[in-house]
UniProtKB/Swiss-Prot annotation:
Belongs to the peptidase M20A family. DapE subfamily. GO terms for biological process: diaminopimelate biosynthetic process; L-arginine biosynthetic process; lysine biosynthetic process via diaminopimelate. Its EC number is 3.5.1.18. GO terms for molecular function: acetylornithine deacetylase activity; cobalt ion binding; succinyl-diaminopimelate desuccinylase activity; zinc ion binding. NCBIfam families: dapE_proteo (TIGR01246), PRK13009.1 (NF009557). It catalyses: N-succinyl-(2S,6S)-2,6-diaminopimelate + H2O = (2S,6S)-2,6-diaminopimelate + succinate. It comes from Shewanella baltica (strain OS155 / ATCC BAA-1091). Catalyzes the hydrolysis of N-succinyl-L,L-diaminopimelic acid (SDAP), forming succinate and LL-2,6-diaminopimelate (DAP), an intermediate involved in the bacterial biosynthesis of lysine and meso-diaminopimelic acid, an essential component of bacterial cell walls. This is Succinyl-diaminopimelate desuccinylase. The active site is at D72, E137 (proton acceptor). Zn(2+) 2 binds at D103, E138, H352. Zn(2+) 1 binds at H70, D103, E166.
Length: 379
């Protein structure tokens, strides 16, 4: 069968054609639900405010294997810089182009195709298969996976293993899987001063001057050494805003946004304590608020990682490398329930970029990997 005609390719194209810029779903979940319903899944839409979610399940017993993913995509950017229209899926030289091709409509299609093939071969499989799909992963992540998990937890419905379809691969399909993620903590700091004329500094109090030594020291602090699973905790200033835009006005306040990506060697509470102690040491007048974006998690050796290793080896012929580097995913909302979480998806070289694309043959291989994982865990 030509690669252009793979079932996974056709479904990926159908999903890309729906311009589901976050938090829109644009019918993607309905398309998936129709396919899953036809093979015995119970479909439960969960709509929270502007976000469309879907919980689909086949089976009533444990263990529960869950495919997790998102139908929303990031904005296209300058459309004139795309080789082809971003929501007109187009195959060129063996690559499928379109917004969401790699992140993550290709993975969603591979999940559905793998499940259809698995159920056809194993209609009486062990346990249950589930899909947790949201349209809020690329946005503020308020009404998406976290709300679905809250609903499941309230009725004591547990996930045993979760496979998130985020584009984990770097150079070739399956060379890297993510078996954990660092925690993420954001600080929003306002350093207060007194606004005034730059010619009369004795009548004002410049918050930028006051904050500069603090920020310099904060940016050079050593937080931890990491461990065998996680790199050392990192700190980055993301935004600094102060002033009126005029050259003759001392600002009355300085706003700073910063972020920690932290290992299991520290906790959010420890980071907060150290930052606020430094603020006090510099005798700053300030307000600060904190946003907890997710706890660090790790899935070590066990059935899920073993099954994934076997699948990638069987389909691609090489060994995978479990890593915890990179950004956050919705896996951070699933892991605290006790589920084992892993991420496996396409090559991530073009995600969020102009001319996002995925290798068509990789989609077929990804579907095969997902199917083997199901066989390893539920047969």
């Amino acid at each position: 069968m030509p690669a252009d005609d793979y079932p996974v390719t056709e479904l990926t194209k159908a999903l890309i054609a729906r311009p589901s810029v976050t938090p829109l779903d644009e019918g993607c979940q309905t398309l998936m639900a129709e396919r899953l319903s036809a093979i015995g899944f119970n479909i439960e839409p969960m709509v929270f405010e502007d976000t469309t979610n879907m919980w689909a399940r086949r089976g009533n017993e444990g263990p529960v294997f869950c495919f997790a993913g998102h139908t929303d995509v990031v904005p296209t950017g300058d459309v004139s810089r795309w080789h082809t229209p971003p929501f007109v899926p187009t195959i060129i030289d063996g690559y499928l182009y379109g917004r969401g091709a790699a992140d993550m409509k290709g993975s969603l299609a591979a999940m559905v195709i793998a499940t259809e093939c698995f159920v056809a071969k194993h209609p009486d499989h062990n346990g249950s298969i589930a899909f947790l799909i949201t349209s809020d992963e690329e946005g503020p992540f308020i009404n998406g996976t976290t709300r679905v998990i809250d609903t499941l937890e309230a009725r004591n419905e547990k996930i045993t293993w979760a496979l998130v379809g985020e584009p984990s691969s770097t150079l070739k399909l399956g060379d890297v899987v993510k078996n954990g993620r660092r925690g993420s903590l954001t600080g929003n700091l306002t350093v207060k001063g007194i606004q005034g004329h730059v010619a009369y500094p004795h009548l004002a109090d410049n918050p930028i001057h006051k904050a500069a030594p603090f920020l310099a020291e904060l940016s050079q602090m050593h937080w931890d050494n990491g461990n065998e699973f996680f790199p050392p905790t990192s700190f980055q200033i993301a935004n600094i805003n102060g002033g009126t835009g005029a050259s003759n006005v001392i600002p009355g306040a300085l706003d700073v946004m910063f972020n920690f990506r932290y290992s299991t060697e520290v906790t959010a509470d420890i980071l907060i304590e150290r930052v606020e102690a430094l603020l006090k040491a510099h005798e700053l007048d300030y307000d600060i608020s904190w946003i907890f974006n997710g706890l660090p998690f790790l899935t070590g050796d066990g059935p899920l990682l073993d099954a994934t290793r076997i699948a990638i080896r069987q389909v691609t012929g090489y060994e995978t490398d479990p890593q915890t580097t990179g950004g956050t995913s919705d896996g951070r909302f699933i892991a605290p329930t006790g589920a084992k979480v892993l991420e496996l998806g396409p090559v991530n070289a073009t995600i969020h970029k102009v001319n996002e694309c995925v290798k068509v043959d990789d989609l077929e291989q990804l579907a095969l990997c997902y199917e083997v994982i199901l066989e390893q865990l539920l047969c």
